[in-house]
């Protein structure tokens, strides 16, 4: 078990989610507001906003919170956030990409650098690790919509590059350029996805021992706890034994 799905499942284990739910809601609301402000407040015409709303629903964010975040984008006195990316290294030479939204670059850079340093990592220059990742689209469906063969056939026909299917559902990966077309084709067949968006996917993953793995997970948790941080992407894989321990 390795890669993006493994990491996502670990970071969303129950205890972790319960402990940071209010902070998660705040970050989701910010992304919804930013997406609505950059485009149209109509999710049918704004793919980024639609993806943000799906992410909020997946976390059981109340409908009122979602609608309030969209309306906030129309306010003249609302904060102006910009997207920014940081790159760095963790224990064992693992690579990390951090996506943040900030209204103060200096504050966010200082917070992210401190998070790296406190947990045995180091912040690097932009471009230092991005070449190890691909910017791709991901469209996720629950396992109940189709069996693995049916989803694979539909995804390839739609122009996707890869499909991962299991008990947790189906995760379709496609090139960034074909993200819109693939999403539309899959929706026509299976309905609205559970989750969709653009991510940084590691081209290759490195295996780390359990001691290093625990340090890396701690590093990611510290980074994710920063208010301005939206997503963290990694290129390491953990042993099945450590995964089971972390999910217990």
Curated annotation (Swiss-Prot):
It is found in: Cytoplasm. One of its GO terms (molecular function) is DNA binding. Keywords: Cytoplasm, DNA-binding, Transcription, Transcription regulation. Disulfide bonds: none annotated. GO terms for biological process: regulation of DNA-templated transcription. InterPro entries: Integrase-like_N (IPR017856), TACO1_YebC-like_2nd/3rd_dom (IPR048300), TACO1_YebC_N (IPR049083), Transcrip_reg_TACO1-like (IPR002876), Transcrip_reg_TACO1-like_dom3 (IPR026564), YebC-like (IPR029072). One of its GO terms (cellular component) is cytosol. Belongs to the TACO1 family. NCBIfam families: PRK00110.1, PRK12378.1, YebC/PmpR family DNA-binding transcriptional regulator. This is Probable transcriptional regulatory protein Mrad2831_3553.
């Amino acid at each position: 078990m390795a890669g993006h799905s493994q990491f996502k499942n670990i970071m969303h284990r129950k205890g972790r989610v319960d402990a940071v739910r209010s902070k998660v809601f705040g970050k989701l609301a910010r992304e919804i507001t930013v997406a609505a402000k950059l485009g149209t407040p109509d999710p049918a015409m704004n793919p980024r906003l639609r993806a943000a709303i799906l992410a909020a629903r997946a976390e059981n964010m109340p409908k009122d919170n979602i609608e309030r975040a969209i309306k906030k984008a129309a306010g003249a006195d609302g904060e102006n956030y910009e997207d920014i990316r940081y790159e760095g290294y963790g224990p064992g030479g693992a690579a990390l990409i951090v996506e943040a939204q900030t209204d103060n670059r200096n504050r966010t850079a200082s917070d992210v650098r401190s998070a790296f340093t406190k947990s045995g990592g180091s912040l690097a220059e932009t471009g230092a690790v991005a070449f190890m990742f691909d910017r791709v689209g991901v469209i996720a469906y629950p396992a109940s919509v189709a069996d693995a063969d049916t989803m694979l056939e539909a995804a390839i026909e739609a122009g996707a590059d890869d499909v991962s299917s299991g008990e947790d559902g189906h995760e379709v990966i496609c090139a960034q350029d074909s993200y819109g077309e693939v999403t539309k084709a899959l929706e026509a067949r299976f309905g609205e996805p559970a989750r969709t968006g653009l991510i940084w996917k590691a081209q290759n993953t490195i295996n780390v021992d359990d001691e290093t793995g625990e340090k890396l997970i701690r590093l990611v948790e510290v980074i994710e706890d920063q208010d301005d941080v939206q997503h963290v992407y990694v290129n390491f894989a953990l042993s099945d034994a450590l995964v089971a321990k972390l999910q217990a």
